[in-house]
Amino acid sequence: MALWGGRFQGETSALFKLFNDSLPVDYRLFEQDVVGSIAWADAIASVGIITATECSDLKKALNELLVEVKGDPAIILASGAEDIHSFVESALIAKVGDLGKKLHTGRSRNDQVATDLKLWCQSEGAALVARLQTLRSELIALAEREFDAVMPGYTHLQRAQPVTFGHWCLAYVEMIERDLSRLTDALKRANTCPLGSGALAGTAYQMDRHALAAALNFASPTLNSLDSVSDRDHVVELCSTASISMMHLSRMAEDLIFFNSGEAGFISLSDEVTSGSSLMPQKKNPDALELIRGKTGRVYGSLVGILTTMKALPLAYNKDMQEDKEGLFDVVDSWAICLDMAALVLSGLVVNRPNALLAAQQGYANATELADYLVSKGMPFREAHHVVGVAVVAAIAKKIPLEGFTLAEFKTFADIIEDDVYPNLTIEACLAKRDVLGGTALAQVKQAIAAKNAG
């Protein structure tokens, strides 16, 4: 039986029921709905709506239901209930009779679902924090293993300057740490309890909402009933945080896909995160990384979806808000599996050091060092930049690296060049000169890894 049937005389259309029912989506809020109902039983007992014995009986039945559903989750969807709240109430009434009909006193599905959803976000958010921390640890471990592996750094996807693989790993550690910070902040803002807000104006029973919030492990109750039942900022923020994090994961995946390609060959991926071709037996495809990149779009889509759903809703609750969950659940599921998969990819990744080093030695990645050398001899940087550009053109024509010029040839570009230019053009020199906070010098990378491990 619907929770709202008394107002209606005609039968509900089967098509409308299919369209209106949300149980196929919100069944995932079962545990939160039961936990919230247990807290609500205590709250209405505290204001004399039910006796202590009735409260105990309700809580006992709710806990039994929790155990039963955990043993056989299929019974939720098999019930045909309108939503998860209807399922719990119907199951409760089946256990304790008319006493079960008292539980909803003073409560609306509006504050009930808002509470369930915040509880779910807190629980899933904590698991996501742990996943982000695991990925951070894998990046740091990989940075330690390959801290001194040299490879080209890129701008515009062209070889720019040599960097270390450890430095590359630490760049993504910074991004993951910002993701952690954003998620932690979002969960802090979501840590308020809407229960007791009623449909929109507040419950008519003078219960202690601070105690109710504490019983559900919220930091505090919400402060405005209209906002409480119509707020979905926590959904938007979680989807937004996930979108930014997925953008970082997608960028990392793109880097690794390129590094793994035959054109680069800087890394090798484990067999456990790659697949083959049904036609071409030689193929070893980076499918895990490509799926991370691909799933980013669906996460973005869910963020845009909830923003669009909420953008023109008047206060307070509107049925449009039933559409908040499907996208959120998909975002959390997608983000979680991508974090797990990224960590797995990194755990088995090996750098092909000779290939990476050879690539770093090509492409005139030491051109900036030659310009800096000229500056050290007194030449203004803009002039040095021009001189080195001319030298690079000449080197390309001769098919030699910059250090392949004889001293006499170097002097045709700038007479101030001496024999001491050659030590400045080695890969080792290029790296060592970046010995500044945040730089790619080995000493800086070691210090950064140590700091991350300490943190």
Curated annotation (Swiss-Prot):
InterPro entries for this protein: Arg_succ_lyase_C, Argininosuccinate_lyase, Fumarase/histidase_N, Fumarate_lyase_CS, Fumarate_lyase_fam, Fumarate_lyase_N, L-Aspartase-like
Biological pathway: Amino-acid biosynthesis; L-arginine biosynthesis; L-arginine from L-ornithine and carbamoyl phosphate: step 3/3
Subcellular location: Cytoplasm
Its EC number(s): 4.3.2.1
Primary localisation category: cytoplasm
Keywords assigned by UniProt, alphabetized: Amino-acid biosynthesis, Arginine biosynthesis, Cytoplasm, Lyase
GO biological process: arginine biosynthetic process via ornithine; L-arginine biosynthetic process
GO cellular component: cytosol
Enzyme class: lyase
UniProt-listed CDD domains: Argininosuccinate_lyase (cd01359)
GO molecular function ontology, one term from the record: argininosuccinate lyase activity
Reactions catalysed, as given in the entry: 2-(N(omega)-L-arginino)succinate = fumarate + L-arginine
Family membership noted in the UniProt record: Belongs to the lyase 1 family. Argininosuccinate lyase subfamily.
PANTHER family hit by this protein: ARGININOSUCCINATE LYASE
Protein name as catalogued: Argininosuccinate lyase
Organism: Shewanella sp. (strain MR-4)
Gene coding for it: argH
